[in-house]
């Protein structure tokens, strides 16, 4: 079985091949996210504690958190769930995944070191891989360097040099996100002013509409009364003519 170790404190990763089942028994019947002491792997691992992050079986099917079995199941998966990436919007698909319990049929395990032991592991804990990429968000840069709102964040961006295939070396600086600039303030004021003007226009249009509607209703009411009066006068005239003939 291949054991893929990761040590977040140094940023390094390393794989080890372990063929002796006796050493691997300490992982059997353990679940994902469970912490395991790995003293049985050898003297160099004495005192180390790892967390099981996942793994694959011998056919390549991945482990899925929350499936309490050591075998394979077929689940209807959708966007946002692990072990599946949708190809179309709203697409769901039934896929085979392995449960979250480790057994002898696993071919690879992902392990994260949560507690360092007594000795150093070459290529994993003996050196530190420097981070080339720093934070991009303005608030996180301020938090990292303990800056105030009035300090210039652009002077504290973490940059790194990158050599391109043509041999040219350039300094790469990330674009700062959510940075408050005069242009952004002006744009926000413009949008607020536009929104306020739109509300005033809607209010004026609604008032004009209600005024026009009231005028139209009054005209309709007056016309209806006029028709009623005209009909009544015509009816009274016909009655007078009938009585005069008699």
Swiss-Prot record:
GO MF entries: structural constituent of ribosome
Task of the protein: Component of the 40S small ribosomal subunit. Plays an important role in controlling cell growth and proliferation through the selective translation of particular classes of mRNA. Part of the small subunit (SSU) processome, first precursor of the small eukaryotic ribosomal subunit.
Classification via InterPro entries: Ribosomal_eS6 (IPR001377), Ribosomal_eS6-like (IPR014401)
Subcellular location: Cytoplasm; Nucleus, Nucleolus
A Pfam family this chain is assigned to: Ribosomal_S6e
Primary gene name: rps-6
Listed name of the protein: Small ribosomal subunit protein eS6
Keyword field: Cytoplasm, Nucleus, Phosphoprotein, Ribonucleoprotein, Ribosomal protein
Family: Belongs to the eukaryotic ribosomal protein eS6 family.
Bias type Basic and acidic residues, positions: 234-246
PTM comment text: Ribosomal protein S6 is the major substrate of protein kinases in eukaryote ribosomes.
Species the sequence originates in: Caenorhabditis elegans
Assembly: Component of the small ribosomal subunit. Part of the small subunit (SSU) processome, composed of more than 70 proteins and the RNA chaperone small nucleolar RNA (snoRNA) U3.
Region (Disordered): 220-246
One biological process term in Gene Ontology: ribosomal small subunit biogenesis
GO cellular component terms attached to this protein's record: cytoplasm; nucleolus; ribosome; small-subunit processome
């Amino acid at each position: 079985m291949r054991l893929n170790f990761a040590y977040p404190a140094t940023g390094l990763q390393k794989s080890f091949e372990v063929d002796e089942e006796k050493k691997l028994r300490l992982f059997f019947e353990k679940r994902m996210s469970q912490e395991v002491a790995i003293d049985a792997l050898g003297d160099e691992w004495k005192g180390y504690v790892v967390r099981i992050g996942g793994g694959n079986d011998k056919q390549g099917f991945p482990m899925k958190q929350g499936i309490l079995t050591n075998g394979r199941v077929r689940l209807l998966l959708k966007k946002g769930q692990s072990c599946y990436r949708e190809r179309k919007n709203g697409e769901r698909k039934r896929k085979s995944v392995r449960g979250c319990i480790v057994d002898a049929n696993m071919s690879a395990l992902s392990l994260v070191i949560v507690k360092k032991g007594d000795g150093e592991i070459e290529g994993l804990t003996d050196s530190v891989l420097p981070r080339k990429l720093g934070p991009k968000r303005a608030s996180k840069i301020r938090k990292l360097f303990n800056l105030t709102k009035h300090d210039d964040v652009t002077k504290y961006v973490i940059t790194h040099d990158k050599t391109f295939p043509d041999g040219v070396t350039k300094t790469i600086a990330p674009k700062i996100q959510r940075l408050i600039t005069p242009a952004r303030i002006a744009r926000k004021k413009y949008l607020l002013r536009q929104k306020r003007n739109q509300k005033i226009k809607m209010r004026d249009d609604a008032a004009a509409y209600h005024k026009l509607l009231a005028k139209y209703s009054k005209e309709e009411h007056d016309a209806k009364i006029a028709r009623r009066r005209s009909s009544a006068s015509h009816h009274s005239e016909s009655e007078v003519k009938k009585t005069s003939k008699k």
